[in-house]
Amino acid sequence: MKAAEIREKFLKFFESKGHTIVRSSSLVPGNDPTLLFTNSGMVQFKDVFLGAESRPYSRATTAQRSVRAGGKHNDLENVGYTARHHTFFEMLGNFSFGDYFKRDAIHYAWELLTGVYQLPKDKLWVTVYHEDDEAHDIWAKEVGVPVERIIRIGDNKGARYASDNFWQMADTGPCGPCSEIFYDHGPDVWGGPPGSPEEDGDRYIEIWNLVFMQFNRDAQGNMTPLPKQCVDTGMGLERIAAVLQHVHSNYEIDLFQALIKAAARETGVSDLTNNSLKVIADHIRACSFLIVDGVIPGNEGRGYVLRRIVRRAIRHGYKLGKKGSFFHRMVADLVAQMGAAYPELKEAEQRVTDVLRQEEERFFETIEHGMSILEGALAELEAGSSKTLDGELAFKLHDTYGFPLDLTADVCREREVTVDEAAFDEAMTRQREQARAAGKFKMAQGLEYSGEKTTFHGYDEVVFDDAKVIALYVEGASVQQASQGQQAVVVLDHTPFYAESGGQVGDQGVLANASVRFAVSDTLKVQADVVGHHGTLEQGTLKVGDVVKAEIDAVRRARTARNHSATHLMHKALREVLGTHVQQKGSLVDADKTRFDFAHNAPLTDEQIRRVEEIVNAEVLANAPGIVRVMSFDEAVKGGAMALFGEKYGDEVRVLDLGFSRELCGGTHVHRTGDIGLFKIVMEGGVAAGIRRVEAITGDNAVRFVQDLDARINAAAAVLKAQPSELTQRIVQVQDQVKSLEKELSALKSKMASSQGDELAGQAIEVGGVHVLAATLEGADVKTLRETVDKLKDKLKSAAIVLASVEGGKVSLIAGVTADASRKVKAGELVNFVAQQVGGKGGGRPDMAQAGGTEPANLPAALAGVKGWVESQL
């Protein structure tokens, strides 16, 4: 039974039992930004289990795409070397949300395994939590599993309820016992039943875990029954396929064999048992589906995990002798295997291929040099007694050659060498500190402060009349007063000034009273809720305890707000035009523009840019109100607000609804979309592999931009004596005229050169039977020089010729030698003889060579020496 059929039978079986088939969710969890990747079937139902979300069904079944690589769940180093470790796998599951419980879950599992899949009953063993008599009795008395094949597993992890057979979502919350089903491969395979000293062997393989969410655990460890008991089960498709296909390794199932053969084809390897082929076959699945779900190779977060997996696959291909791109060509093979089950893979095939090809090309630029350095270091270790690679070297490989630490460790492991990870971490920390010191980091980040928090009023006010100075810093040190002319940081108890955050720059403005004026040039956070006002004391003496009027530059704030609100609309529009894989990777919003970096693997076309502008400006014209609500993070995400992985969110978040956009945002914004005014994209380009950047302007800036553009178009039209509407046509006409004139000019130059060539032939001097000619051809370009040399060679029969021209202070040289003379006189050596004297160099074939120089004053003497040089060669 093939993997595709196993998947289909699972889903159809539970559909027949009243379950709704639910599509696999994204590998990027939409409801939990703290989770790196979706790693089980229950992730998309987490809020349902917690009671925070309701679904129109109480029974569900899924085939969930899952990844375990990076973070807590990291199987990367074992992938390819064991029978059952993968970065990507499919989890088949059935779920009950307050509907059926243990009895039905157990009976369903048994019916599917023994009835639909027709596994021998005597090959199946089960485990239960040692206190779960209910599950034990259902297995023994109702299903009929012999008690000797039902194993009670106790608290084998050192504490009450700390057991392989007791599941917990977290330290508190829903939890309960679980029952695992094992398949016995028979006595020919080493290993013992679960709970025995030999349980790590391969004879008894877990194929299905049935989790019974029965209790709620509080902070004190007390267990109380849940009002709605739930079921969460998970069976790895690859594991059950290995059992049903009578093989002992997941890599031997049909799905993997097809990918292993594809890897062998691309790397030219014939041994299909090679572990590197298994690595590549596994990694093409993880990489492709991560890209499908919007992850792009990068240097942080999910993007860096993806980059590590891609580069590990490339390294194993390199190990097999593949010195060029190959990995991306396997996407088509994966689509053939899994495209029917996951149409989103088929739809994204070209995008996935392009992203992988770009990442391969990027790494192949450095892998050979990096591997050479690593191999040299390993050879030195083998010659000595140490078995530890220097962490500083591992960091150099990471920093200079793009080798992730686990890739270096992977290579070392094959030689039984470890990496000094502590030294690697020290080098990484040192580099970060140097980067911070070298970067433009403002004083606020290093200030020591332990006072009260700043209350922010800037969402509603641009002025706060009675703000009290609660701290002062000069040159990074806490002081009680600042004097006129000093630069300082002022901390207030209340402020309307927005501190730089979320890509939005800090406010500028003034702090003042009757005797003091402090010009604020920037606003930064000293701590999460403490605002530092950076600037210069222009008048008076400012003391801790003084009361000042805090007033922001309202015009600058309004422009910044327009740009920030436009960023939200543009983000949404980009996702509509390019696809939901578009994710924000960085932004900068100030009074002049918005700069937005996002995940996308190709330049935007003119039509795509125009479409984004149309969508945003349509939202502006709709003049929709901006609605701000404060709510819990879970409620915000449930309501569709976009949350960014890696951002830190508190228990309560600020949600901005603006037109068709809904995002979590703490920045300042317009009251209505119409306040944005005109929106115009002025730049689009790439900033890194898979990352594009768009810059846009709004309001009066956009109007001025369009007016300036209009003025330039009108001026250009006037120069070309055309109407603006006819400008393109007129430019094409001028280009055609220029091409025609260039063609005529080239013909005239050729004719002139031919004429000069006839005259120059008479200047040749015979030396040892070879006609030697060295001369300057006025006004000739390189093409004309070459044509003239060819004609002179034909005319003179046996010759060594150097022709030169001077244009803009630069010398062009062409040397030509006829075939009979080139055995002794080489054109490359001849042209270099002249070039070295005019400050240049060159080279070429024995019969024709080219050079240049920058010292035309030396040209006459250099050409005069050609005759003597040729004589010396004959």
Swiss-Prot record:
Zn(2+) binds at H564, H568, C665, H669. It comes from the Bacteria. Keywords: Aminoacyl-tRNA synthetase, ATP-binding, Cytoplasm, Ligase, Metal-binding, Nucleotide-binding, Protein biosynthesis, RNA-binding, tRNA-binding, Zinc. One of its GO terms (biological process) is alanyl-tRNA aminoacylation. One of its GO terms (cellular component) is cytosol. Its EC number is 6.1.1.7. It is found in: Cytoplasm. Transmembrane segments: none annotated. Binds 1 zinc ion per subunit. It catalyses: tRNA(Ala) + L-alanine + ATP = L-alanyl-tRNA(Ala) + AMP + diphosphate. GO terms for molecular function: alanine-tRNA ligase activity; aminoacyl-tRNA deacylase activity; ATP binding; tRNA binding; zinc ion binding. Catalyzes the attachment of alanine to tRNA(Ala) in a two-step reaction: alanine is first activated by ATP to form Ala-AMP and then transferred to the acceptor end of tRNA(Ala). Also edits incorrectly charged Ser-tRNA(Ala) and Gly-tRNA(Ala) via its editing domain. NCBIfam families: alaS. This is Alanine--tRNA ligase. It comes from Paraburkholderia xenovorans (strain LB400).
